Amino acid sequence: SVLLLQNQEVILLSFKIFRKNCCGLDVHKTWIYACIGITDTNGRTTYKQTRFSSFSKGLKELSTWLAKYQCTEVCMESTGKYWIPVFNVLEKEDVSVILSHPKYTKPQKGNKTDRKDAKWICDLFMCDMVKPSFIPPADIRHLRDLVRYRFKLICMITGEKNRAQNCLTVSNLKLDDVFSDVFGKSSRSITEYILKHPGDLFDVTPFVDRRCKTPIEEIQAAVDGAISPEQAVKLRQCLNHIDELEKHLEEIEQEILRL
């Protein structure tokens, strides 16, 4: 029930209770505020409120506390990533956890506290006024995390390749004009030689794959540049980082295939 003041008259609004025993959680980085609402056969609701640490010990205590009151339905906001450890622990205990976007559980204006927020979430959940967010099964979540990380690695590799290409450009080493892939076998071999022997004149023929369609004369002209010491250091670090990231990418892709 909610009390509203309109034209100096008190109006009582009643909401149907769909869940007789449920819990609302206000999850933060360090603490988790919990409120269980238990409604008896007469429609009277009593609340049990407490606070738990967000450490693993606190999550186990939360699970035990819910079991004590035979509460198997929980609702919490999807705030940042803090909800994920809570969800993982409760999911293993066969607790039905509803995740909701904060805009659907926005608390009332006024004297706002974490305990009141937990009770507000509990009340909304109790009256079935919370729009749940979709949470895929555990195996799909695991796969999704790896796929997202794979995408991040690809973006990082692309960024490093762009920085490496910039080093070649400012050094007037126009490998991108004569090779379709600046980081391919032939181009990479030439780049490695330039880094080991800066300023040396050399014949590119031994480094170029025989299947390369670009004339040797053009490739020879493309490497007629000069790389400064600072650009050489930067290029070396970029290439090393690319190799390291590609190794990580391969490991992640193998794990994705395993799943």
What are these regions (language model features)?
Residues 1-259:
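A detector of single, family-specific signature residues
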